[in-house]
Amino acid sequence: MFRLSIGAAALLSLMAGEARAQDQNEMVKKGAQAYRICAACHSLQPGVHLSGPSLADRWGKEAGTIGDFGRYTEALKKSGIIWEESSLDGWIAQPQAMIPGTTMTFRGVEDAEVRKNLIAFLREALSTGGAERMVKSGLIPESMATGPMPEDVSSVGDNQRIKEIRHCRDGYYVTTADGAQFPFWETNVRIKIDTSARGPKKGEAVLVRSGMVGDRASVVFSSLADVNQLLAEKC
């Protein structure tokens, strides 16, 4: 009878453990869906910084300490916050209340259940090798793990490589290496700099057209020096 009781207790303990694991897996699965709100500004890939810093391997780490990300606020860098369940719950709920003056433009998640599920996912995704595991398990697509990276313009055709760009009155006038010429209204052009390996080669500018009728464009330079050198005010 005593042996049966021990066996029954062990079985009940095993069943309880399996139930907890199933509950945790379900939370992670739901959290993966909620992660879309984070993926709009962050990457899970190491060293890939977008609007916000990479989240790779940040579980249990101090906030504001990624050396090659320079856009932290002083308040966050001095906060001493360690990223784990309770701190992430407060941050995701009301980032402005937790760190006044933060530049993270995110209104927060009011639903405590959604936050709980999201944090369960982040615990897995923000650990070492988390992005690869989350993609491999089918919880998120690779594109979500990478985040919304800008177009790779390190190698483009003559139809995008800019031969001349000048500003005159209310317009930008772009001539590409294939000889095509495009006049754009000045407010429809975004001047960008991409210093990453995915950006233009030094001394080059790249045209990226957009808009429903192609009337909008980004002009991407590799540095501010190239902007000053290649962009002229000339009519």
Question: Positions of the model-derived regions?
Answer:
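Electrostatic cytochrome c docking/interface patches
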Residues: 17-34
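Gly/Gly-Pro-rich "capping" loops immediately C-terminal to redox-active cysteine motifs
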Residues: 30, 43-83, 165-166, 175-192
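The canonical Cys-X-X-Cys-His
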Residues: 31-45, 118-122
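C-terminal capping alpha-helices of c-type cytochrome domains
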Residues: 83-136
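Short boundary/loop segments of OB/S1/cold-shock single-stranded nucleic-acid-binding domains
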Residues: 136-156
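Structural detector for short beta-strands of small beta-barrel domains
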Residues: 150-169
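Flexible glycine-rich surface loops and low-complexity tracts that mediate binding to linear polymers
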Residues: 200-218
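OB-fold/S1-family single-stranded nucleic acid-binding modules
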Residues: 212-235
